Amino acid sequence: MNRLKEKYNKEISPALMTKFNYDSVMQVPKIEKIVINMGVGDAVQNAKAIDSAVEELTFIAGQKPVVTRAKKSIAGFRLREGMPIGAKVTLRGERMYDFLDKLISVSLPRVRDFRGISKKSFDGRGNYTLGIKEQLIFPEIDYDKVTKVRGMDIVIVTTANSDEEARELLTQVGMPFQK
């Protein structure tokens, strides 16, 4: 079993139960899924850009991402409906815990001038969004093979009812929030 999942079951869940006075274990918020999205705006001109983004996301997440396509045409961006414009991957279960563990303990500390992540990125429903400016912070990405530095969005979806509950859950898991 993953060490983060073990920690959740043994320490975090009972701590949250006492803090928020839940009656049942099923009320305790837990992490449902993690969605990693990488927008590839230059895929409009360069078709190979989407392939490199898909390859990088596969290395980072450990599973093959889905190519996202444009919903409508936008003339200003020279974009047609159905053109590939990004890639996303949804992690659940064991892979989700592995990725979160790697993100907290290895990748985030590698960010330049890292002082913690923002406390304000909650959406009001207990989900947290984290923007990453470069994919090079992940150990799986080989610096020499990177054609272009790309950022990505990481959304952590929880079953929490409020931002306060979700913040407490993520703090207990070990997310390095700003003081």
Curated annotation (Swiss-Prot):
- Write out the GO biological process terms: translation
Is tRNA-binding found in the keyword set?
A: yes
Question: Does Ribosomal protein appear among the keywords?
Answer: yes
Q: Which GO terms describe its cellular component?
A: ribonucleoprotein complex; ribosome
UniProt keyword list: Ribonucleoprotein, Ribosomal protein, RNA-binding, rRNA-binding, tRNA-binding
Q: Name one GO molecular function term.
A: rRNA binding
Name of one Pfam family that matches: Ribosomal_L5
Spell out the subunit comment: Part of the 50S ribosomal subunit; part of the 5S rRNA/L5/L18/L25 subcomplex. Contacts the 5S rRNA and the P site tRNA. Forms a bridge to the 30S subunit in the 70S ribosome.
- What family is this? Belongs to the universal ribosomal protein uL5 family.
Quote the PANTHER family the UniProt record gives: 60S RIBOSOMAL PROTEIN L11-RELATED
Function, as annotated, reads: This is one of the proteins that bind and probably mediate the attachment of the 5S RNA into the large ribosomal subunit, where it forms part of the central protuberance. In the 70S ribosome it contacts protein S13 of the 30S subunit (bridge B1b), connecting the 2 subunits; this bridge is implicated in subunit movement. Contacts the P site tRNA; the 5S rRNA and some of its associated proteins might help stabilize positioning of ribosome-bound tRNAs.
The molecule here is called: Large ribosomal subunit protein uL5
